Design a protein with these regions (language model features):
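Hydrophobic helix-and-loop "lid/oligomerization" segment in the mid-to-C-terminal part
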Residues: 1-12, 16-56, 60-61, 66-69, ...
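Fold-independent oxyanion-binding glycine-rich loops
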Residues: 8-10, 39-40, 62, 89-92, ...
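Glycine-rich, phosphate-binding/catalytic loops in enzymes
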Residues: 23, 103-106, 127-128, 184
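Hydrophobic/aromatic beta-strand patches that form the interior of the parallel beta-sheet core
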Residues: 35, 85-87, 108-112, 127-130, ...
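Short, hinge-like loop/turn segments at secondary-structure boundaries
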Residues: 51-56, 105, 128-130
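A generic local secondary-structure boundary/capping motif
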Residues: 74-77, 98-101, 128-131, 151-152, ...
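Short alpha-helices
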Residues: 114-185
């Protein structure tokens, strides 16, 4: 490949970010021109760089800062050639891709994901690595890093980003965990992943907490065991998907609630 592009899903979360950083690390270590294709609204990446910057930790691979190799879909598209490789992480459906244009332009594609296979899976892939039993895509990428090269040095910042992805999707190691999850976490801890920084990453501001409390307070139980919260007019809220996910997680911690749902309403449907 002349260039490597790594792309997560739209509105990337910590798992998508950790996985893109991990795969970009592998590309850079091979001496390849490597780019991360990101969506327009990337609040999680901004958050992780802010937390690391506050500790004077630079998220980089050797002399390359990851923020410097990030490209929007529009900026990345002219760089894609017939020899380029696109690594798709943490999703496998075109509708979820950070850039559909880059996806369609890339002739050589690899998918690495932990979600169950959907009917509308992206086709024409060189390699398809779907592992639904894995806790997260960050776990899968950490395993690949472990197998890749003994000389590959993972920095504490890179390890922290991958660790954050595992923590997010396992809800702090409470769900969807197995032996491989803890082995990956142990590898990242040996590389310097910082749990204290992880806790800072998952802190929410007061406005976010108030929004979540409002949604929970307005939740209804149409039938026993099912609780539904509805978030309306969310078109301009870049954190709406995160808010919905956290609201649903909170609903199922309520006694007598077996299923928690948070529905986000957009004007375009």
């Amino acid at each position: 490949a002349d260039r490597i592009f790594v792309m997560g899903h739209v509105n990337e979360d910590y798992d998508a970010i950790g996985a893109t950083i991990g795969m970009a690390k592998l590309g850079l270590s091979l001496g390849k021109e490597t780019y991360i294709v990101s969506s327009e609204h990337n609040a999680y990446y901004k958050r992780i760089t802010e937390v690391l910057d506050n500790e004077n930790i630079i998220l980089s691979a050797n002399e390359t800062k990851y923020i410097d190799i990030m490209r929007s879909g529009a900026d990345a598209l002219p760089l894609v050639t017939n020899k380029s490789l696109l690594i798709i992480v943490d999703h496998h459906r075109e509708v979820l891709s950070a850039s559909k244009a880059v996806l369609q332009a890339a002739k050589n594609r690899i998918i690495i994901d932990h979600h169950r296979r959907a009917e509308d899976i992206i086709g024409d892939t060189t390699l398809l690595y779907l592992e639904p039993s894995s806790s997260s895509t960050s776990e899968l990428v950490t395993e690949l890093i472990g197998y890749f090269d003994d000389r590959l040095d993972i920095t504490p910042a890179e390890a922290t980003a991958l660790y954050a992805g595992i923590v997010l999707d396992t809800k702090n190691f409470n769900v969807q965990t197995g032996e491989r999850t803890f082995e990956a976490a142990a590898l990242l801890r040996r590389c310097g992943a910082n749990p204290n920084l992880i806790r800072q990453l998952f802190k929410d501001d007061l406005s976010f907490v108030q929004q979540k409390a409002k949604l929970i307070a307005g939740a209804k139980m149409p039938i026993p065991g099912l609780s539904i919260a509805i978030m309306r007019n969310a078109d301009n809220d870049t954190m709406s998907s995160v808010l919905a996910a956290q609201t649903a997680d909170t609903l199922i911690t309520i006694e007598s609630v077996a299923v928690g749902m948070a529905i986000v309403e957009y004007k375009d449907g």
